[in-house]
Amino acid sequence: MSNVAETIRLSDTADQWNRRVHINVRNGKATMVYRWKDSKSSKNHTQRMTLTDEQALRLVNALTKAAVTAIHEAGRVNEAMAILDKIDN
């Protein structure tokens, strides 16, 4: 089975920090794990979501549409293409 794993660090907010999203394959299903710390407790928080194939595709579609719209509206097409080139390599 393929080993796919990616971690995306998110920016801190006023009440949450050390936020990250892990995307991996677990038991043949796409899994998204959100981890964070907050100001209300000292424990580490984890939320795990196993996605169906349809949910995974809908998530990718929604993120792609949002990213393309934001990049286009900000006039950063060249910057986006440079980022995509890095991902492909």
From Swiss-Prot:
| Quaternary structure and partners | Interacts with host lon protease; this interaction prevents the degradation of antitoxin by lon and thus the toxin activation.
Name of the protein: Inhibitor of toxin/antitoxin system
Q: What exactly does this protein do?
A: Plays a role in the inhibition of the host toxin-antitoxin (TA) system. These modules made by the host and composed of a toxic gene and a neutralizing gene play role in stress response and programmed cell death. Gp4.5 interacts with the host protease lon to neutralize the degradation of the antitoxin that would result in the activation of the toxin and the destruction of the bacteria.
Keywords from the named record: Host-virus interaction, Toxin-antitoxin system
Lineage of the species this protein comes from: Viruses, Duplodnaviria, Heunggongvirae, Uroviricota, Caudoviricetes
**Please, which domain of life does this record's source organism belong to?**
Viruses
